[in-house]
Swiss-Prot record:
Motif extent (HXTX 1): 34-37
Molecular function as annotated in GO: hydrolase activity, acting on ester bonds
Enzyme Commission identifier(s): 3.1.-.-
Database matches in InterPro entries: 2H_phosphoesterase_YjcG-like, Cyclic_Pdiesterase, YjcG
Keywords, in A-Z order: Hydrolase
Protein name: Putative phosphoesterase SE_0715
Biological source species: Staphylococcus epidermidis (strain ATCC 12228 / FDA PCI 1200)
Length: 169
């Protein structure tokens, strides 16, 4: 069973992000806009209830998270990914740190950069053109996310689905 943990924003902000993703993100149909808290990890099916309990325990002291998408940014030159940058807060960092440890399916490969991906799988020329447009359009969105979502990847459908949500705090 392949799982991941993410913060999923309100439907209205998902719609705003998806307006870009429909055009510029080749993973648009695979997953909704989100902030990755724990990248994909694999468990045995019989460990599912243990994982749910572990997630509940790890978030019990973490309050709902304020998310502020502040501007368009990118991961170039490492990869041609464009995203809406989310201001890193203590509570976001705490949530990330709870799940990126050796005792919970390993430490993250990359530093924590909270964001909503809006474009990926681009050529260098596409990247330059799209980044310029998106940067000009800008973003300034705030909301409080009260749930951590547990997602499961279906290899058959090549898609991520929310299978459980956990209330923060």
């Amino acid at each position: 069973m392949i799982l991941g943990l993410a913060l999923v924003p309100s439907k209205s902000f998902q719609d705003e992000v998806n307006a870009y993703r429909k055009r510029y993100d080749n993973h648009y149909a695979q997953i909704m806009p989100h902030i990755t808290i724990k990248p994909q990890f694999e468990i045995d099916d019989h460990d599912f209830n243990l994982i749910k309990n572990e997630v509940k325990n790890r978030i019990s002291s973490i309050k709902p998270v304020e998310v502020h998408a502040t501007k368009a940014s990118n991961f170039a030159p490492v990869s041609n990914v464009i995203y809406f940058k989310v201001a890193k807060t203590e509570s976001l960092e705490q949530l990330f740190n709870q799940f990126n440890t050796e005792d919970f399916y390993g430490i993250a490969e990359h530093p924590f950069v909270p964001h909503f991906t809006i474009a990926q799988g681009l050529t260098s020329q596409e990247f330059e053109d799209i980044y310029g447009q998106v940067k000009l359009a800008g973003v300034d969105h705030r909301e409080i996310i009260e749930e951590l979502s547990l997602l499961q990847y279906s290899e058959e459908e090549d898609k991520w689905t929310i299978i459980e949500t956990f209330t923060l705090g």
